[in-house]
Amino acid sequence: MAKITRALISVSDKTGIVEFSRELAGYGVEILSTGGTAKLLREAGLKVKDVSEFTGFPEMLDGRVKTLHPKVHGGLLGMRGNPEHVATMKAHGIEPIDMVVVNLYPFEATVAKPDCTLEDAIENIDIGGPTMLRSAAKNNADVTVVVDHNDYRLVLDEMKAAGGGVSKETNFRLAVKVYQHTAAYDGAISNWLGARTGEGVAAYPDTLTLQFKKAQGMRYGENPHQSAAFYVERDVKEASVATARQLQGKELSYNNIGDTDAALECVKQFAEGPGCVIVKHANPCGVAIGDTLLDAYDRAYKTDPESAFGGIIAFNGELDEATAKAIVERQFVEVIIAPKVSAKASEVVAAKKNVRLLECGTWQKEPMPRLDFKRVNGGLLVQYTDLALHGELKVVTKRAPTEKEMIDLLFTWRVAKFVKSNAIVYGKDGMTIGVGAGQMSRVNSARIAAIKAEHAGLPVAGSVMASDAFFPFRDGLDNAAAVGITAVIQPGGSMRDEEVIAAADEHGMAMVFTSMRHFRH
C-alpha cells in the first residue's frame, strides 16, 4: 500500500480533528484545509496549507466555492496506476491527494430548529463536501476517505502498523460508509424541501427517502422459510427495542423483536405505578398495574396463564430480584425487557441462559411523534404513530361511571389501543380480566374476552369493557351485560349509537364515548 503524503481536511464537526491531524503530521502528511478548520489547526500549532494556495484560485461567493477545482478533484480522482492519468495530472500540475477528511454542513440540525427559515436551510446544504467525499470514495483504491470521527483511531492504527498507509480493504469499507452518509444527507434535504413545494409545509414530502442501518442478521423471518434482517434508524432518540441492550440470552428472532416492541410500547402507557404487559403474537394477553413490580406481574399473569407461556414480558420499572425469581419459577418466557435490571435480577435470570434479557433505559413521559410504515405490494403506507389517547370524553348514558369505574375504563382503554382489531378488553382494579383480539366481528371479540376470563378463573362481574371502535349493533352491549360488565368505553360514531346507548341504559350500564378510534391491524 502507498504511503499517505497529502490530506485535505475540512470538517463541520471538529470532534477529535486536532489530535487526528497532529498524528497525521507526525507521519509527514501535508495538510490542506479551508476556513474554520484551517484556523483551528493553525491555532493548535499545526502547519496548514490553504486550499486556495494549493489550487491557485481564491475562495469566492461567500465561501460557496472553495474546493470545486480540477486541482482538487483531479488529485482525488486520478488513478495512480493508470499511466494516462498520471501523465495528465503531471501535464496540468495536479498533485495527488491521498486522504480526504470531511463531514458536512449540519443540515438536519439546522432544520430541526423551530425558527429555521428556507434561507437557513439552503445555506446549510453542503456542495463541496459531498463532491469531495464522492470523488475520494470513487477512487478508494488510491484514496482514504474519512467521514466519521469515530474512524480516526482505526485509520491511525492502520497507518502505524503499515508504515503510513491504509489497506485497500479498509479504504473500500470507508468509501461505502461515505456513500451511505451522502445518501442519508441528500435524503434529508430531499424530504425537507419536498414538503415545501406547495403552499405551507406538507405533512408528507413529494418523495420519501428513508435510511436504516442493518443491526442484525437473522436465522429466519416470521417463518423458517423466510430470510430476514433487522434494520434500525440512524438516530433513535427514545428508549425502544431498537436501542435496548441485551444482557443475556439467545439472539433475538424476528418475532421476538416485533412482540417485544408491542409489549414495551404498551407498558409505556402506564405511569401511575409499577406496570407489566405480557404479549403473545403481538397482542397483550395480560396487563396490570400494582403496588410493586411483582404485584403487577402476578396480576398480569393471572389474566391468561395459558397464553403467557412463551410470551414477552415488559415492565415500566427496574426489574428486581423478587419479580425475576417469580418469572423464572413460574413460566417459560422468551424475552424480558425493562428500563433497568438490577444486578440481583440478572443473576436470577442467568439460571435460564436462553431467556433474552433486555435493558432499554428510561423514556420520557411524552412520546416523540414518528412515522409508521406498512409495506403493500408496490407501495408503502405511511402514517404518524397513534400516540393520542382520546378526544373529548362524553358520558352518553343516564348513569355516569363511578370514580372507580372511570379509572378502570381509562385503564382498559389504554390496553385496547394495543390489541389487534376488533379489540375488546375487560378489566377491573387495574388489571385485565379478559382480552378478545383480532376477530372479524366485535361481538365475537366480546365473547372471547368472557371465555378467557372464565378459563382463567377470573370473575367478570363488576368489570368494565373497552372497545377500540364503535359498536355497530347493540349485541355487544347485551353480551357484556350478561356477564356482569357495569361500564363501557368506546369511540362512538355508529349509525346505531342511539340503539347502543339505549341498550346500556336498559342494563343500567354507564357508557363513555372517547371521540377517538384505535384500530390496530
Swiss-Prot record:
Residues 1-147 form the MGS-like domain. Belongs to the PurH family. Transmembrane segments: none annotated. Its EC number is 2.1.2.3, 3.5.4.10. Keywords: Hydrolase, Multifunctional enzyme, Purine biosynthesis, Transferase. SUPFAM superfamilies: Cytidine deaminase-like, Methylglyoxal synthase-like. The IMP cyclohydrolase activity resides in the N-terminal region. This is Bifunctional purine biosynthesis protein PurH. The keyword Transferase applies. It comes from Geotalea uraniireducens (strain Rf4) (Geobacter uraniireducens). One of its GO terms (cellular component) is cytosol. One of its GO terms (biological process) is 'de novo' IMP biosynthetic process. PANTHER family: BIFUNCTIONAL PURINE BIOSYNTHESIS PROTEIN ATIC, BIFUNCTIONAL PURINE BIOSYNTHESIS PROTEIN PURH. One of its GO terms (molecular function) is IMP cyclohydrolase activity. It catalyses: (6R)-10-formyltetrahydrofolate + 5-amino-1-(5-phospho-beta-D-ribosyl)imidazole-4-carboxamide = 5-formamido-1-(5-phospho-D-ribosyl)imidazole-4-carboxamide + (6S)-5,6,7,8-tetrahydrofolate; IMP + H2O = 5-formamido-1-(5-phospho-D-ribosyl)imidazole-4-carboxamide. HAMAP family: PurH. InterPro entries: AICAR_Tfase_dup_dom_sf (IPR024051), Cytidine_deaminase-like (IPR016193), MGS-like_dom (IPR011607), MGS-like_dom_sf (IPR036914), PurH-like (IPR002695).
